[in-house]
Amino acid sequence: MANFDLTRINCQFLDRHLTFPLLEFLCGKEIYNQQELLEYILETVNKTNMIDYTMDTRKRLNLSQEMPEELVQRKAEVLATLKQLQNEVAPIMKATDILKNGESMKDSKTFVNALQKDYNFKVEHLESAYKLAKYLYECGNYQESTSYLYFCLIVMSPNDKNYLNVLWGKLAAEILTLNWNTALEDLTRLRDYIDSANFSTIQALQQRTWLIHWSVLVFFNHPKGRDLIIEMFLYKPLYLNAIQTMCPHIMRYLATAVVINRTRRNALKDLIKVIQQESYTYRDPITEFLECLYVNFDFEGARLKLHECQTVILNDFFIVACLNEFVEDARLMIFETFCRIHQCITISMLADKLNMKPNEAECWIVNLIRNARLNAKIDSKLGHVVMGTQPLSPYQQLVEKIDSLSMRSEHLAGLIERKSKQKQNQESADSWKYY
């Protein structure tokens, strides 16, 4: 299934350190040649200051059991540079400890005033803290790096030349330390900054494309992520446009989120529209499963695609943890759609569509009706399933209307903004005629 593997594409939009978990995940699969994969990891890790990881990778390649002289020298240089940077930051070390432990210092002005008064804080100290945070990150010490990055966020002005780099670095470090709550906060902060910054159209598109890829790591690991990924990718026109323009392969993760999120079935209609629009640029078993089921009503095709989906998900680092849930919810979708069309069907026919034995299918349907509160009945004597109507709840109708209005409002706001910019540019161009 190498033809459906997105690791190579995804890594183009990730920080070097964020690619290591993906590459290590692939080492446990049989998609690519292990030797070539390890050689690529070694090539990549050599561009960082993670000397121990470099040595470990060399051992896995059977290159050497002892550290080469070149690495010994590099390690000494890394430690020396680290010590030098720590000495430069020493005057504010106590301040970062206070910030780490005290919630009262989270107000930026209060904290900066305290720094200047108690620690003789100077601008060069901020530059040193930034350099140390970046160096610690390059060494793979992500936890300690987050402390200095947080310090920089509190003290720095949003207009500082390094502020955007700090936002990206903080998000990456929190992802790599698996601090998903903080990572979500950093993701929101970074998104707000990108959306309000005075970037050119191309720059904004590039920034959003990178953020989309990084956010997938957060969304599939945070309890609220399944709702948030739908809201951001499907109902925020700027991000949907970035996906359609730069990275249509992200449709895989949006589609997965909708399938495993039973409370957001109202998003299916909008998702299917986007999948159909982008089908000429990107297709995979997950998007094709939804097309088979909701566009073509091809249940045999959906059954075959569901089988392919399992292989795709099993080999995708981002969504592998969702495998069982995806299969269960995909079967539910097949069941609901098939019963809605046919109303009365035999259990044996349904078992065939779900890739199950008749007795397993009956058991599964009974549990489904009981747990999901579906309006359906089973006639065990005749071996029939009779599906009743399942009205959309007022809450679901309200959510659907709000999402639709929100999307239209953002689209209109974007249109007005573009027209305003065009008018300003035209006025600016006309003004040159008088000189």
Swiss-Prot record:
UniProt keyword annotations, A-Z: Cytoplasm, Initiation factor, Protein biosynthesis
Q: Where is the PCI domain?
A: 219-392
Coiled coil stretches, renumbered: none
What biological process terms from GO does the record include?
formation of cytoplasmic translation initiation complex
**Family, similarity comment:** Belongs to the eIF-3 subunit E family.
Known partners and oligomeric status: Component of the eukaryotic translation initiation factor 3 (eIF-3) complex. The eIF-3 complex interacts with pix. Interacts with mxt.
Protein name as it appears in the record: Eukaryotic translation initiation factor 3 subunit E
Q: Which gene encodes it?
A: eIF3-S6
